[in-house]
Swiss-Prot record:
Disulfide bonds: none
Annotated protein name in UniProt: Proteasome assembly chaperone 1
GO cellular component terms, A-Z: cytoplasm; endoplasmic reticulum
One GO biological process term: chaperone-mediated protein complex assembly
Biological source species: Xenopus tropicalis (Western clawed frog)
Gene name tied to this protein: psmg1
Length: 287
């Protein structure tokens, strides 16, 4: 190319440029392989027991008939379900969810009937097989939330489905013009989809408070699919499992769907005592 006298031109080498392009192409291919491997590793796996699998496969639309799903998220919510509902003994383990992310390494399907401390476990009512409970102590990453909902609810018949979600939240995150120090902690708030018509035993969650994590993902999924769903959030000032926060969920037993699932009071108190004691032992560094 013609140029004027004294102009400095940059040196161009076709060979070097082609080598750089080849290296960049190799790096991009390697990056794509790494991303694909991570995506495979972060897949959410839902495993049902043989009876449920057979029921799904024999169904005309290959979905499990289901009238009620109760999802408990976190230690205190699962503690309530374990003490007040599962302690009746009329439940059986029917499935589990395994996943992998930066805070959860529960990636291997379980072969026994006992839930792992950091797993999602499904229980089915023996007296009414259309009722399912899911206890979730796992951390579900943001990129896994939609997949979680798709995998779980994609296996269930939605025509007569109702969903109830329980979780806790630090009272410091509750947005109110009043001081949180004056609030009667712990306390319940409810958030429901437009299809949910039943009365709730506590005040509704006020704006600008919002749901997040798995409860928000489940509620959003139910809103889109027009599934009646309600989310009960317990605001507490304690981060660990404790009987006071667990008992804060007791008003839910006044709901018709929950009251018929409640265990006997003697079994409730015994299981509650064991649950709290077990948590205290595990949190003691000297034991």
């Amino acid at each position: 190319m013609a140029t004027f006298f004294g102009e400095v031109q940059s040196v161009f080498s076709r060979a070097v440029d082609e080598d750089d392009e080849e290296e960049e192409g190799e790096e991009e291919e390697e990056d794509r392989e790494i991303i694909a491997e991570l995506e495979r590793k972060r897949e959410v796996h839902v495993t049902w027991n043989p009876e449920v699998t057979a029921a799904i496969e024999s169904s005309p639309n290959r979905r499990l008939p289901c009238s009620n799903v109760i999802l408990s998220v976190g230690d205190n919510a699962t503690g309530f379900v374990s003490s007040y509902i599962l302690s009746s003994g009329s439940w059986e383990v029917c499935g589990s969810i395994t996943l992998w992310n930066e805070r959860c390494r529960d990636c291997n399907p379980r072969k026994d009937s006992l839930p792992a401390p950091s797993s999602c476990t499904f229980y089915r009512s023996i007296t009414d097989p259309t009722v399912l409970l899911c206890q979730c102590n796992s951390y579900i990453a943001e990129d896994q939330l939609f997949q979680w909902c798709e995998k779980v609810f994609g296996s269930l018949e939605k025509s007569s489905l109702n969903v109830t979600v329980l979780s806790t939240c630090p009272v410091s995150e509750y947005k109110t013009p009043e001081s949180t120090y004056s609030l009667p902690v712990p306390f319940l708030k409810a958030l429901r989809t437009s299809e949910y018509r039943e009365e709730v035993p506590c005040p509704l969650l006020e704006q600008p408070n919002i749901a997040d994590g798995l409860p928000a993902a489940v509620l959003t999924y139910c809103q889109v699919w027009q599934i009646p769903a309600v989310f009960y959030r317990c605001y507490t000032d304690l981060s660990k499992l404790d009987s006071i926060t667990i008992d804060a969920f007791r008003p839910l037993l006044s709901c018709q769907r929950m009251s018929r699932l409640a265990a006997d009071s003697a079994k409730i108190q015994e299981t509650l005592r064991k649950t709290v004691k077990s948590s205290e032992i595990q949190s003691n560094l000297y034991i």
